[in-house]
């Protein structure tokens, strides 16, 4: 520690600028608080793209900014989040640009309930992955249990509340306490032994109960050994640990979770008044069913008595029924015979129509008809095609360039054979070919003005 930091920094003789003040304050802070541990709760957690981690560490009365640079952040195993209680180690420094002091951290560890909460989440995830929380493993509670084992502390309000509920709702149920510690170093082992003992006693159901407390107080119910002992129980088990807001690993593994020990007792203690009403309802239903059964038996007996008194009537009824069956059978046989006869006639008719001789005669008749129609069709087709050809030849002659030339016109062609359409395409002295309706002439351009062109014949 520095005994006289002001004398060391020369603050008694020198007037400093703000930058100098912040710089010397940073040196002083880093020298005095170079390696310290601080405990608090994370808030305002930020993770920029640089990989550094920034957050505020606070308690009920104050807060301080913290910086965890990338190389140190990579060594932190637990996931940091707002609300997590942690212990941090680092040095106090000053951000000179703003004059804010902050902690430059090299280590972050969970603290208090924060460490327990991380362990809780890790075990919960592990057991869930193994299927210990699945609905298929849950055993339904008995509707009317007679013997119930209670695993809890022999002292305190929990056992008194459970007994009070059973005395009020189901005094006939036999309760057996398997005493165990529910807090402290020995609690886990004692709870595991109590669960094994209770499961071997053949109870109808078990209650695992404890009153409220902090996460640390209830921690034995979050131990893996207790969770696996609960899962191994064949007897249906209700977990009632802590208050309604408390949740333990044993709650997830048990067959049923009750928010409080009293609620667990109510789940397993059927209301006596309800049972009485249920018995009365069953009695009324039984009486009604017995009356209905007696009535049906009486009617049946009367019917049997009537049949015994008149056997002749029964024989007459049977004879009449036999005659009716005989008539129905004869009519059915006749219908079948007529149906088969009609089908045979239809088949014979179809067979005659398919006879080869008849088919051959039909084909020969059709062939003669086609042979007679073929010459006429060919002559008519040729006549139509000849008329079409003559019409097309006349149309072609009308639009033919030769027909135009025959009327006194000519076509002028240059030496490359291109048609001359106006005087601008020619020049004086150019030799051209004039194609007439009959024959050709060689001509020479004498004048190529837009006035009519003067041509002269070549010798």
Curated annotation (Swiss-Prot):
Record bears the keyword Signal: no
CDD domains assigned to the protein according to its UniProt record, in alphabetical order: ExoVII_LU_OBF
Enzyme Commission number, as recorded: 3.1.11.6
Gene Ontology biological-process annotations: DNA catabolic process
InterPro entries, alphabetized: Exonuc_VII_L, Exonuc_VII_lsu_C, OB-fold_nuc-bd_dom
GO MF annotations in UniProt: exodeoxyribonuclease VII activity; nucleic acid binding
Protein role: Bidirectionally degrades single-stranded DNA into large acid-insoluble oligonucleotides, which are then degraded further into small acid-soluble oligonucleotides.
Subunit structure: Heterooligomer composed of large and small subunits.
Identification of the protein by name: Exodeoxyribonuclease 7 large subunit
């Amino acid at each position: 520690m520095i005994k006289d930091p002001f004398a060391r920094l020369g603050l008694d003789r020198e007037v400093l600028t703000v930058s100098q003040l912040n710089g010397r304050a940073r040196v002083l802070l880093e020298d005095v608080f170079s390696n310290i541990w601080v405990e608090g709760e994370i808030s305002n957690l930020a993770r920029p793209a640089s990989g550094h981690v920034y957050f505020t560490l606070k308690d009920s009365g104050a807060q301080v900014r913290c910086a965890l640079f990338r190389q140190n952040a990579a060594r932190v195993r637990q996931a940091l989040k707002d609300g997590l209680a942690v212990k941090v180690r680092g040095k106090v420094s000053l951000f000179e640009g703003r004059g804010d002091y902050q902690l430059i951290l090299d280590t972050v560890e969970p603290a208090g309930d924060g460490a327990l909460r991380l362990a809780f989440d890790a075990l919960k995830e592990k057991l869930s992955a193994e299927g210990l929380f699945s609905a298929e493993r849950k055993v339904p509670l008995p509707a009317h249990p007679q013997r119930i084992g209670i695993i809890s502390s022999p002292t305190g309000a929990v056992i008194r509340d459970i007994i009070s509920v059973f005395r009020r709702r189901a005094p006939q149920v036999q309760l057996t306490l398997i005493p165990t510690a529910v807090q402290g170093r020995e609690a886990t082992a004692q709870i595991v032994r109590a669960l094994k003992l209770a499961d071997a006693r053949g109870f109808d159901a078990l209650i695992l109960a404890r009153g409220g407390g902090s996460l640390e107080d209830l921690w034995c119910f979050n131990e893996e050994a207790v969770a696996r002992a609960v899962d191994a129980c064949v007897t249906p088990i209700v977990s009632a640990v802590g208050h309604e807001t408390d949740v333990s690993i044993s709650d997830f593994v048990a067959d049923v979770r009750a928010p409080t020990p009293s609620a667990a007792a109510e789940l397993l203690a059927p209301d006596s008044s309800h049972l009485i009403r249920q018995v009365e309802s069953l009695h009324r239903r039984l009486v009604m069913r017995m009356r209905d059964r007696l009535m049906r038996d009486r009617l049946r007996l009367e019917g049997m008595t009537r049949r015994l008194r008149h056997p002749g009537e029964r024989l007459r009824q049977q004879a009449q029924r036999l005659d009716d069956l005989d008539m129905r059978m004869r009519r059915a046989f006749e219908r079948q015979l007529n149906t088969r006869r009609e089908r045979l006639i239809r088949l014979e008719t179809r067979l005659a129509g398919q006879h080869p001789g008849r088919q051959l005669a039909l084909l020969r008749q059709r062939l003669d008809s086609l042979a007679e129609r073929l010459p006429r069709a060919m002559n008519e087709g040729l006549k139509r095609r000849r008329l079409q050809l003559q019409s097309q030849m006349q149309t072609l002659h009308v639009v033919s360039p030769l027909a135009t030339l025959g009327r006194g016109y000519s076509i002028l062609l240059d030496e490359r054979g291109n048609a001359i359409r106006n005087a601008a395409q020619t020049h004086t002295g150019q030799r051209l070919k004039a194609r007439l309706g009959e024959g050709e002439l060689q001509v020479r351009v004498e004048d190529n003005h837009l006035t009519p062109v003067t041509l002269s014949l070549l010798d």
